[in-house]
């Protein structure tokens, strides 16, 4: 597949691009700064400008392409975003994330791109950046859990899910096959961060409360994107993306007793089972995370 990948210069994007390339996909990185990965054409644009998005999606991306007309994209992967609150002002975070996502999905729709995969977030569940302590409505948290966040970043992601759902419905109404999958990505961890950060999480599990005690290896996130590229015909779907185990040393039953007293338990919490359910992704697209921290720390 030829993939229009936004945000490939970021923490998650760099790993995802490499996983896609290893699977044989041709990836063009769209960002504001270069990623510097070998054999990766790049276009540096402002995704909040719809004209620039449409232009980038319809032009040549590399000198090797110039013997023919610009090639269409087979898929769009949209990871670009202001990555959290408290980087700039809240309004700018919300505006940039909502506008860029609308522009990317609209361009994909108008150009007939059959698949869009976009980064949503664990924050949509309203725990991560909540004002004060907010516990999940139940655990493990699955995709049916309410999404009523307090912060501008998570609000932008909720809006982006609505945008995606609406464009997919519009395509279906027009009789067009267009799949749009949203990834509610948990805290992304690079390989070097296991030794760097996880001893502190083992010593003080409370540090992971706002992340619902979960995490996702950056390489496994790339695998999830590959799984979504390989799975057609689902229409609009959202998927939790995390590793199968928790990010703390304490057994999950103990974590629930300590931090989630009174919270209904709706699934198995044996061993170090994640509190961020990925059953849907495993069943519907074949997601099977391979990397974890327990053999390294």
Predicted regions and their residues:
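C-terminal substrate-binding subdomain of Rossmann-fold SDR/epimerase-dehydratase oxidoreductases
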Residues: 219-297
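N-terminal Rossmann NAD(P)H-binding glycine-rich loop of SDR-like oxidoreductase domains
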Residues: 3-23
């Amino acid at each position: 597949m030829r993939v229009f990948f936004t945000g490939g210069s970021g923490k998650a994007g760099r790993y995802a691009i490499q996983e896609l390339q290893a699977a044989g996909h041709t990836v063009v990185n769209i960002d504001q700064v270069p990623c510097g990965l070998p054999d990766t054409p790049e276009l540096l644009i402002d995704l909040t400008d719809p004209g620039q998005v449409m232009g980038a999606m319809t032009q040549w991306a590399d000198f090797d392409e110039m013997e023919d007309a610009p090639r269409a994209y087979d898929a769009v992967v949209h990871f670009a975003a202001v990555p959290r609150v408290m980087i700039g002002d809240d309004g700018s975070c919300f505006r940039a994330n909502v506008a860029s996502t609308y522009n990317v999905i609209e361009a994909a729709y108008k150009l007939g791109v059959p698949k869009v995969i976009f980064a949503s977030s664990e924050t949509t569940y309203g725990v991560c950046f909540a004002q004060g302590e907010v516990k999940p409505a139940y655990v493990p948290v699955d995709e049916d859990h309410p999404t009523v966040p307090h912060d501008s970043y998570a609000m932008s992601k909720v809006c982006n899910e609505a945008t995606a759902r609406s464009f997919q419905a519009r395509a279906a109404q027009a009789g067009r096959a267009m799949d749009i999958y949203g990834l509610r990505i948990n805290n992304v961890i690079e390989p070097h961060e296991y030794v760097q950060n996880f001893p502190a999480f083992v010593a003080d599990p409370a540090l992971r409360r706002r992340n619902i005690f979960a995490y996702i290896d950056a390489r496994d996130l790339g695998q999830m994107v590959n799984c979504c590229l390989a799975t057609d015909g689902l229409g609009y779907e959202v998927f939790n993306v995390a590793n199968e185990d928790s990010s703390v040393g304490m057994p999950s039953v103990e974590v629930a007793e300590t931090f989630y007293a009174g919270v209904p338990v709706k699934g198995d919490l044996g061993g170090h089972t994640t509190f961020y359910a990925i059953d849907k992704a495993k069943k519907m697209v074949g997601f099977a995370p391979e990397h974890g921290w327990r053999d390294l720390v």
